[in-house]
Design a protein with these regions (language model features):
Chain A
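ABC ATPase nucleotide-binding domain helices that frame the ATP-binding cleft
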Residues: 43-46, 142
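Helix-to-loop junction immediately C-terminal to a conserved catalytic motif
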Residues: 50
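ABC ATPase nucleotide-binding domain
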Residues: 5, 25, 61, 342-344
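The feature captures the beta-strand-to-loop junction immediately N-terminal to the Walker
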Residues: 35-37
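ATP-binding/catalytic-site motifs of ATP-hydrolyzing domains
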Residues: 59, 65, 211
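Non-catalytic connector elements of ABC transporters
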Residues: 237-239, 248-362
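ABC ATPase nucleotide-binding domains
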Residues: 31, 72-229
């Protein structure tokens, strides 16, 4: 079975711990994205799976076998590198054929396989060229072709689309997804681009400082972020995280002070478990309704900056106490700079994070 | 247009002329000519009749260029000097004798290429090691290796002579080749290490993941990428070794004498003063092998020297 499993994997470089106690399992046919800001340990995790870095602690299990002490060439994996890492002195065709030499595949079979993947990835016309003679998109596809030309245990992608322009990125995203769907292999994709992760992954593992903060489906990590970091990392524009002072909770409504304003907003019932004190309220910019009259369930703020984004408009508003709030409204809603807004958060989309930043949810 | 005619003649084929303009191109040509002048003078001297070598004013050209050059600057070219390199009479009335220069040319070519190639093989492997598997104190070792080139030859020659005499390497091919190899190694390791340092480590990682062992990564992936570096290192090493005089003078025997040593002896023997045309003929012949190697490797050489200075 083509699976990947990390069991309490830790990787240290000297005194620096790049990956801390990571547990992750990827089923056959599943695509898992490691997502996080730069330096969060996602690429190190990938290199540990590939065997390019040894683990300090824990176990790397690929296809049911512990691979800790096996060098990369014995792990039977395929990897696509951020900078493609095509062999500069070999033609594109030879590049794609390279992994097949080690599998002892005969010349005719080799040519057939190269031609097959070249056809899938539209590379037939560049097979005889050198890597520095083809376009960025073709390089990406050649690197991809080299990975899928044989039948490895699993696929690893390191920021596969980061070097492409926006348009090409969109089409490649689709292509990669399509190719991967037909292969039923465990796949790990490292990216710092949440859109890439949300669109390509079956599950997303969000990393920060070497730790996995949350693993879940794209829908889960967006709708039910496990903590304030995940909440702020996923979604554009960023979720509003407002410091609040929780007073009481009764009948599904929490009384609290947010930026100097006393509010009574409906929240998750689990908030009842919290002691009164400091919490963080998370509301996505699209989860506000602007109402004409303010009441105890609305936050009043003044529009400071307006950014039209096409179908929607992003408003940067500021409360009297100086808290910044991002609000997205539809294009038809005309708001002028300086206008007073009464913002009512959608109770189903209002997240409460406790003092440690952990989501409070039933 | 003048340019199109010149273009057809092969001028300006490089876009350099268009960019730099004719003025600058000509200025560079003049400087280049000044640099080449001594070499050209030696080559011409090799073709002059013996008496012409020291004429004042000198003869300058083998042809009058359709009357452009006055007759007293024109010499009558001859191949006689080249013949005398290999065979000439050693006494005023004696019959021509073989000079042994064929042997010396063979020695020069054999010793220089053997030692440079040997240094290239050992040095490239060592450089790869230094670059990819750094030891604790890597830079110190590299520095120590370079110190062998910091002393002038004259400083180390006496202990080397003594050591060679004790182990019986004096005058043997093995001895001189070993010595040159050792001297070329420092240079080779430093050169090749910088080439390996420039390579993208991702490419090697990719090859490992694709199933290559360390050896295969080196031979199939790394080595093809540093061909320019190998060529550059080879040529520079060859030029240094080819022209080396002092070690060759003191450590080669009659059978292993190299051309620079033999040249020295040809000049100072015979008691007739220096035979300048003969010397020029030897020098001209001596130029040819290194000139050819450099010429055939020059594309690699240029890429080798400018390696890493262009955006990857």
């Amino acid at each position: 079975m083509s699976t990947i499993e990390l069991r309490k994997v830790t990787k240290r470089f000297g005194s620096f711990t790049a990956v801390k106690n990571v547990d992750l399992s990827v089923a056959a046919g599943e695509v898992v994205c490691l997502l996080g800001p730069s330096g969060c340990g996602k690429t190190t995790t990938l290199r540990v799976i590939a065997g390019l870095e040894s683990v300090t602690d824990g176990e790397v299990v690929i296809a049911g076998k512990v691979m800790n002490n096996l060098p990369p060439e014995k792990r039977d994996i395929a990897m696509v590198f951020q900078f493609y890492a095509l062999y500069p002195s070999a033609s594109v065709g030879e590049n794609i054929a390279f992994p097949l030499y080690h599998d002892g595949i005969s010349g005719a079979e080799r040519t057939a396989r190269v031609n097959r993947v070249a056809a899938i990835l539209h590379l037939e016309h560049v097979l005889d060229r050198l890597p520095n003679q083809i376009s960025e998109g073709e390089k990406q596809r050649a690197a991809m072709a080299r990975a899928i030309v044989r039948d490895p245990n699993c696929f690893l992608f390191d920021e596969p689309l980061s070097r492409l322009d926006v348009e090409l990125r969109q089409s490649m995203r689709g292509q990669i997804k399509e190719v991967l769907q037909g292969l039923s292999k465990a796949t790990v994709i490292v990216t710092h681009d949440q859109l890439e992760a949300l669109t390509m992954a079956d599950r997303i593992a969000i990393m920060k400082d070497g730790l996995i903060e949350q693993v879940g489906s794209p829908h889960e990590v967006f709708a039910k972020p496990a903590n304030a970091f995940v909440a702020s990392f996923i979604g554009t524009p960023q979720m509003n995280l407002l410091e609040a002072d929780l007073k009481t909770f009764a009948d599904g409504t929490a009384e609290m002070t947010v930026a100097g304003i006393n509010l009574a907003i409906r929240t998750d019932a689990a908030v009842a478990r919290l002691q009164p004190g400091k919490v963080t309220i998370g509301v996505r910019p699209r989860a506000f309704t602007a109402t004409d009259t303010g009441d105890r369930g609305t936050i009043s703020a003044r529009a400071e900056l307006i950014e039209p984004m096409g179908a929607e408009t992003l408003i940067h508003a500021r409360t009297a106490a100086g808290a910044d709030i991002r609000v997205v409204v539809t294009r038809s809603q005309r708001v002028k700079v300086g206008e007073a807004l009464n913002l009512r958060p959608d109770p189903r989309q209002t997240h409460v994070f406790d003092g440690a930043g952990k989501a409070v949810r039933s | 247009m003048a340019e199109s005619i010149l273009g057809k003649l092969g001028f300006g084929r490089a876009s350099g002329v268009d960019k730099a303009g004719w003025g600058r191109t000509l200025a560079v040509a003049v400087v280049a000519f000044i640099y080449f002048l001594p070499v050209l003078f030696i080559i011409f001297t090799a073709f002059k009749p013996q008496g012409d070598a020291l004429l004042v004013p000198p003869t300058l050209s083998p042809t009058s260029l359709f009357g452009l050059i006055p007759d007293h600057f024109v010499f009558k070219p001859t191949l006689e000097n080249f013949g005398s390199v290999f065979s000439r009479s050693m006494t005023p009335d004696g019959a021509p004798e073989a000079t042994g220069f064929d042997r010396y040319f063979f020695n020069s070519i054999f010793i220089a290429s053997a030692s440079v190639l040997l240094a290239l093989v050992i040095g490239t492997l060592a450089a790869f090691g230094f670059s990819r598997y750094p030891l604790k104190g890597n830079d110190t070792y590299l520095f120590i290796i370079l110190t062998t080139r910091m002393l002038p030859a004259i400083v180390v020659i006496i202990p080397v002579i003594l050591m060679f005499r004790v182990v019986g390497l004096s005058g043997s091919y093995l001895g001189i080749i070993m010595l040159y190899t050792a001297f070329n190694l420092a240079f080779t390791i430093w050169m090749m290490k910088s080439f390996f340092d420039e390579l993208s480590p991702d490419v090697e990682d990719a090859a490992r993941i694709d199933g290559s062992s360390g050896m295969r990564v080196f031979f199939k992936i790394c080595l093809p990428q540093v061909i320019a570096g190998l060529a550059a290192t080879f040529v520079f090493g060859l030029i240094l070794t080819w022209n080396e005089f002092l070690f060759a003078l003191l450590l080669s025997g009659p059978d292993t004498r190299t051309v620079p040593v033999a040249m020295n002896q040809a000049v100072s023997s015979g008691g007739r003063g220096t035979d300048w045309t003969l010397l020029a003929a030897i020098e001209t012949l001596f130029l040819i092998p290194v000139f050819l190697v450099t010429f055939f490797l020059q594309n690699h050489l240029l890429r080798g020297v400018t390696f890493g200075t262009v955006k990857r």
